[in-house]
């Protein structure tokens, strides 16, 4: 039965059933009622604006049409009929006549609850109508006779009356908080079990029980529970779930299966498991069971001919036992059914021919806990864990002692090394003093030898002078100032002693005098040369002129030899002197000017030989020049004089052990810290992140000493060579390599420094995966879109390839490749038109797919690896804290444990959510990562929006063409064409509204409705297993499905 009438039926009723047209009210009331009608239509603004332009006559017609399209029966109609069935004052004959329609009324009610809008359902359940109470009471009334028949009325009237009394108390409990007079009257009639009315009530109940009223009542409750609002009412009702559970006593296996399916679905809702167990506790009390679930097992064994009931029963047992998270309680429930003989019965039934039942039985057996095996494994594991813990503790103590001994040894070795260096320096000073003293002694010895030789020459000269004086050649005369003057005498003297020999003698005398401390002996005057000798002897040389020989002083000692050339001057034969330009030390590094230089031998004769660039440098402001042209990433300004001396020392004295490029890069890195080597090493040892920036530590990680470098540095130390002779980078590397557990410490510092950044980076990515997975999986509109695509695809392919039941999501990309005959439209464009015309509620389906674009950019595998690495880093920090007392690390561990635990939980949740949604769409999580899965939806949404936009443009073009044609026709015909066109638009709009009103389809309710049906459908297709229980429970209790009152 439908709730609204078809268009054809409307026209028929308009002529035959509907009364005459009601007179039009006054304009004010008309506008108010018209506004209410417009609001109920939920029209777009442009169409609502068009309707407001109607005249009053058309507005009144629209109001009348709308008011005729109302739900056929209001809720109170069904409630009055159900109350009539419960009225104890009704005669037997009248009740028999009424009850003939009870099943039909209940079926109509079920259809109305399932298909009408939520407002109708809320009205049925409100405090005024109390429809849920009436349904539960009628269900209890219908089952009263079933209970009596079950116990056996043949046992005697007293026994049956006692059971009636017990059952009536159950009915009375349904409304212990107060109910209407009619219900109290019916309840009192049942309590009077000895009276005629009590017997009549039981007979009426038996009459009802022979029909399908119990089954349809359960269907009505199921329809109510499919709405969030109704589900809340049923769960909070004191006896609704109890009465549903008691319906298992119905003789119809179909009804039992329906009840068990509904109860199984409730079990998977958070808090529902406790309610179901409470209902079966009540079942045990009412039905006088010795053990809970006793009747259920009895029905399970006896209804072996009805497979659907057995499947539903096995499914319910599996869920009620294995859907709890508390393992102890789960084992308790499992044992509860074992005592009732479930294990033996399943052993007999597991070879059943029914595939559905076999699957459910196997699912239960897969979930069963083998407590004995678990206990044995647990004991073995505990022993192993205790041994491991003991060994780890022992190893920890030994390692700690070893580290202490190593630290003490290293301290002693360091002290000894310092003493050794000090002694080496003292030895160097002694050697230098010894070498200086040896040089002085050697110089003194040479001077003594030279003096001895000079005195010997002096004696020889004196002898020669005495000989000459005795020969009469010269005469020695002492002058007043103490000098000795030599005077040449007669010609005879010249014959034996030439003038050159005399000069040499005087020079020798001068030298001796100089060495001995006496004055030089000048030659005051030389007599004219004697007359030439007789021919035999050789003629003497020509005597000097009188002016030349007046006085011949003794020349001074010869000058010392010339020193080597100056370092600033090059003497070149045939070339002028060239100054060697000294290197200029700048405060900052400057860029290179890539010119082509002349060689020194090319300078001579050029303009460059005439210019002085040093003078220009003295005139320029070089500091400003350096500020303008210095390269980036410069260190602090260094004193120029100090830098000159350091550079010269480095060039001359420093020893380099590292590779040149590596040493250069290390120097650049160290300058960034602006700290000494000792400060850096101390900060690393104390995990001081305030002293060392994280980026500097990360750069320093690239310079961890290699094995070859450590070998070189150790060799240098073994040779006991002084550290101050090492280059600054080599010295840093030497101290750096001495830090205990250097790699581990650097890793911890890097981990601690980057922890917050990593958490802040990973958390949004995990949130994107979780949100996108949940939205894609729970989107009913997307599901409907895929349904449309599957339908059209099967329609196109069925004749050639046959129909299929699903398709890979990658197929969505092919919608644009499938084109129409005229090649103007693709299959996606057509789907967009279909959605707009037939399923307008699906037009914004992409609004339900949240964060798919962000999730598409996430590499879940890398994120999970990063989270795992964070866990390893935290373990490293904890291990370090357990071995050594580091306040910094302890404080970090205390503040960061919560963040890391939350991040790990988020990562697990993201992985599970993604795996679920991928499996839900028929893909494999192993081959379909988020970077492949979510981009499919991103591309599809983008293509769909473009298709919608292109359709709108095409439609506008067609409308423009049509208006152009109409304008051309208007010129040829009556000028009233525009008015006719406007009326035509209004008629189309009215027709569309009527089509929407007459359209019989279930509306898509917002958010959280429809979940119970989804659960039941999923359970029918996929058996419940314990490993999916937790995921399933979260899925069914997602915030997008239920509110906190449900979950």
Swiss-Prot record:
Residue spans of biased composition, Pro residues class: 527-546
Residue ranges of domain GBD/FH3 in the record: 22-462
Gene3D superfamilies reported for this sequence: Formin, FH2 domain, Leucine-rich Repeat Variant
Lipidation positions, renumbered (N-myristoyl glycine): 2
Secretion signal span: none
Keywords of this entry: Actin-binding, Angiogenesis, Cell membrane, Cytoplasm, Developmental protein, Lipoprotein, Membrane, Myristate
Xref: SUPFAM superfamilies: ARM repeat (SSF48371), Formin homology 2 domain (FH2 domain) (SSF101447)
Disruption phenotype: Morpholino knockdown of the protein causes profound defects in angiogenesis. Although sprouting of the intersomitic vessels occurs, the endothelial cells fail to extend fully across the intersomic region and there is no apparent formation of the dorsal longitudinal anastomosing vessel. No other obvious defect is observed in the developing morphant.
Membrane topology note: Lipid-anchor
Function: Required for developmental angiogenesis, but not for vasculogenesis.
Subcellular location: Cytoplasm; Cell membrane
UniProt keyword Transport, yes or no: no
Listed transmembrane segments: none
GO biological process: actin filament polymerization; angiogenesis; cell migration; cortical actin cytoskeleton organization; filopodium assembly; regulation of cell shape; sprouting angiogenesis
Record-level GO cellular component terms: cytosol; plasma membrane
Segments for region (Disordered): 520-561
Family per similarity comment: Belongs to the formin homology family.
One term of GO molecular function: actin filament binding
Domain FH2: 580-970
Protein name: Formin-like protein 3
Principal location listed in the UniProt entry: cytoplasm
InterPro entries in the record: ARM-like (IPR011989), ARM-type_fold (IPR016024), DAD_dom (IPR014767), FH2_Formin (IPR015425), FH2_Formin_sf (IPR042201), FH3_dom (IPR010472), FMNL_animal (IPR043592), GBD/FH3_dom (IPR014768)
Pfam families (UniProt xref): Drf_FH3, Drf_GBD, FH2
Ranges for domain DAD: 1000-1037
